[in-house]
Regions:
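Membrane-embedded alpha-helical bundles of multi-pass enzymes
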Residues: 2-215, 414, 425, 440-445, ...
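Soluble catalytic domains of enzymes that build or remodel membrane lipids, polysaccharides, and related
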Residues: 214-482
Length: 506
């Protein structure tokens, strides 16, 4: 039976393991599956340790393909808005999971010579897989979606460690602890199983109570005399592409904002991504803004900004006369969503980006905090996809009061992708120790406190607005100071352990 499953059908088993593992991610968060899937994967690698590197690569690749196929299928929803793109749906289901899965294949292939049935193998596997996860999210593919660390999103206490070590370090820890039951698989013994289970329970409980203590000891201080009004218009995406609808849409946003209710309050009104089709259009709304907003008000919205033959996905700060006070151009662009890799080549086959129109957005140069002119409060601007980058959302100017994220989650309907996007915001809030406020046209507009607690949110894909206060943590987080350097250090220490273990056992 073992030979049939783990030898003759190794590729099918590997794909199946990855597919089921996708359920550890939000919104399902069946975390316990990780303690079954990872040990089984390690046993599968052990059973095939005498196979070629190519065979080991395919085991890891198919594991990754199953995992990403069932956790990223929702990306095809973004192809529903243009008939010319419908043909890409099957291609998307094959290509995107395949590209990301290559990293898991490489991780498996690289550790072939270390496959054993002991603790050493678990450490090597955890370091290899977490390192390849980091590389695919930061250096080679710019797509850090669906790290295993996001399985803990259901436990606010368990997430407090993010403020100290960050998501990539938690990802390393998650892989490692999921793999521990493997130690009891090869030569099963109740005593060994008891030790493994006790170690897992002790570690998880220690982290939980550490997080609980962190929450209790972190004092949040409210910024006085200041409100943020977050909008969720719930406008159909197809309507937003019609230029003659823009003025009507802006009027609707003002009505939802209800600025006259806050005329004596210092307030920031946050509208979603992609409100204006051209930033120059803002001057058309000078009278409309002046008639509705007061001198106490600033407005943030998303717009396309043109500069010569380049165009940018921008976040813009306006005053109550629709004058541009500041703008930020998006740096992290979505592959095929906002930028077409190898554009000159693919243009010849009539391939365009998912967001409407041909051509690619240009990449912004730098990200700095934006200062409001009503009270000198500063926020860090992030547009949509940029909230998912752990350890690289910050700026050299680290002094800011909160993180502001505008988005358009309507591309992915009411799918798991919309919820996962929201969960990333929670992780960034805890890492940076900053409140995250996010406005999205469709999805989950929300306010997340610096400790990750959800302060306010809208219903899924309903038209509404929420008014929130801004809170600041009484101290900076360790991760906000050192960012992914902490992950580098943990990886280095693990590699030293691996080296010393090999030397000792040679």
């Amino acid at each position: 039976m073992k030979n049939f499953l783990f030898k003759k059908n190794k590729y099918l088993v590997s794909f199946s393991l990855g597919s089921v593992l996708s359920l550890i991610l939000p919104p399902y968060s069946y975390t316990a599956l990780g303690f079954l899937i990872f040990p089984t994967l390690l046993y599968l690698l052990f059973a095939n340790r005498d196979q070629t590197r190519k065979s080991i690569f395919y085991i890891g690749f198919l594991f990754g393909y199953g995992y990403f196929l069932f956790s990223l299928y929702w990306i095809t929803y973004s192809l529903n808005f243009d008939d010319n793109l419908a043909i890409l749906k099957p291609l998307t289901l094959v290509v995107l999971p395949s590209v990301v899965a290559i990293f898991y294949g490489l991780a498996s292939m690289l550790i072939k010579n270390t496959i054993t049935n002991n603790f050493y193998f678990i450490v090597v596997f955890s370091v290899a897989l977490s390192t390849l996860d980091f590389l695919r999210g930061n250096l080679f593919f710019d797509f850090p979606w669906n790290l295993f660390a996001y399985t803990w999103s259901w436990s606010l206490e368990s997430l407090q460690i993010l403020g100290f070590v960050g998501t990539y370090s938690l990802n390393l820890f998650t892989i490692f602890i999921f793999c521990l039951p493997y130690l009891a698989l090869k030569h099963f013994h109740y005593k060994k199983l008891f030790i493994v289970i006790s170690s897992i329970v002790f570690t998880l409980c220690a982290n939980f109570f550490f997080g609980q203590n962190t929450i209790n000891n972190n004092n949040l201080k409210k910024i006085p005399n200041f409100k943020v009004v977050l909008l969720q218009p719930n406008q159909k995406i197809i309507d937003l592409t019609l230029a003659n609808n823009e003025e009507q849409y802006v009027n609707r946003l003002i009505n939802i904002s209800k600025p006259k209710m806050h005329k004596d309050t210092q307030a920031l009104f946050v509208w979603p991504e992609g409100i204006l089709s051209n930033l120059d259009n803002s001057k058309n709304y000078k009278k409309l803004f002046y008639d509705n907003f007061s001198n106490n008000h600033n407005i943030v919205l998303g717009s396309v900004r043109y500069e010569g033959n380049k165009f940018y996905n921008s976040l813009v700060l306006l005053n109550n006369q629709a004058e541009i006070l500041s703008s930020y151009d998006k740096i992290n662009l979505v592959p095929f969503g906002e930028v077409i890799p190898f554009y000159n080549l693919l243009e010849k086959i009539n391939l365009k980006k998912i967001t409407f129109g041909y051509g690619s957005f240009s990449k912004g140069e730098k990200r700095n905090p934006v200062t409001l002119n009503i009270n000198n409060i500063k926020f860090l601007p992030l547009i949509c996809y940029e909230i998912i980058f752990s350890g690289s959302i910050d700026t050299e100017q680290k002094e800011y009061d909160f993180i502001l994220n505008i988005s358009e989650d309507g591309w992915f309907n009411r799918s798991i992708g919309t919820i996962q996007h929201f969960v990333h915001s929670k992780y960034r809030a805890i890492e940076q120790g900053k409140q995250v406020v996010r406005s999205t046209n469709q999805g989950l507009t929300s306010s997340i406190l610096p400790n990750g607690r959800l302060a306010k949110t809208t219903d899924f894909a309903n038209q509404s607005s929420i008014v929130v206060d801004i809170y600041k943590l009484n101290k900076k987080t360790l991760f906000s100071e050192f960012e992914n350097t902490i992950f580098y250090l943990l990886t280095f220490v693990s590699c030293v352990f691996i080296f010393l273990f090999r030397k000792t056992n040679e």
